[in-house]
Amino acid sequence: EAARIVEQAHPDVIDLNFGCPVKKVASKGAGAGMLQNVPLLLEITREVVKAVNVPVTVKTRLGWNKEQLIITDLAEQLQDCGIQALTIHGRTRSQMYTGEADWTLIGEVKRNPRIRIPIIGNGDIHSLAEADAAFERYSVDAVMIGRATFGCPWIFSRHELSLNEKISVLKEQLRINVEHIDEYCGILHTRRHLAASPV
């Protein structure tokens, strides 16, 4: 039912996030917490795919912990549910955001001849050069950049921006946040990103 409500907003895609490791989410069995209940994760995925007429994608992690690295089997099962793409974060839930992302299993999923859907790699990509290296080494179809964009929205630029150009981008980000959220929350949201900015 929730997916049908979301579909009324005419999204291009509905992405199911089974990757959020935050305790208040995962401890309730949501986000990466779903990795401890794969049958339910698959049932939810199948039902959402059946309920909507837009592509459904999934984002998840390698597994719950290093003893439960389930992504190679899970990728096939999710594809069988009818998803159109799979984003894999190269850490387990128990790692949260610590340590280094392990792209080895992401590469294994991509090289699996049974996998026909696009595989999107995620984790520890902080520059276009690192994204290019991930494409080259792991043959992923796309790379998702997350936290590295905080305070650094020019990360996607192919050339180094001057200080004035960076300030201009940050001003534009503030303008957009105020326009699309509201003045108070837009400023607070922008401040959080500015705190992470290397400017």
Give residue ranges: language-model regions:
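Active-site entrance/lid segments in N-terminal catalytic domains of soluble metabolic enzymes
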Residues: 1-79
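Short glycine/serine/threonine-biased micro-segments
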Residues: 17, 29-31, 61, 88, ...
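Active-site beta-loop-alpha junctions enriched in small/polar residues
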Residues: 19-21, 59-65, 91-93, 122-126, ...
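A short acidic, helix-capping loop that chelates divalent metal ions and anchors anionic groups
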Residues: 22-28, 92-96, 154-155
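Short glycine-enriched, charge-decorated loop/helix-capping segments at active-site entrances
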Residues: 29-35, 95, 159-161
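Short secondary-structure boundary segments
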Residues: 31, 87-102
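Alpha/beta catalytic cores of nucleotide-metabolism and tRNA/nucleoside-modifying enzymes
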Residues: 43, 51-53, 67-85, 97, ...
